């Protein structure tokens, strides 16, 4: 179940799944669907608000700041990425590849430094734990005991 960028609801179901089962599933997830439609609307609004100059400024800030934050937390955690890149990703703040390359969206710079540091620690933790298991979150918590509060900051619409 997903909500696309153009605000359409997409449902994937096994071949042969009865239409009634699909309809019932969608109806039972109406609240979730409405919440995610609103999130997509916020993202679309943000996209329209960011002009080229502001995007350029955010990219420059990300390129200057994020490698420094990665270096700082890499030393603390003993986890070192193969590379650090800045992207234009709109639906995720960061990612860590199977080869331990870390990418961060320049949009992360719209959030408070505490939230930025959480994303850095989160992605570095993926170097050791490639999933979101209990061990992964224990590792994140070891280096950032208040990560849950920091994570909540990312759920709010950023200040432009």
Predicted regions and their residues:
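Walker B catalytic acidic pair
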Residues: 123
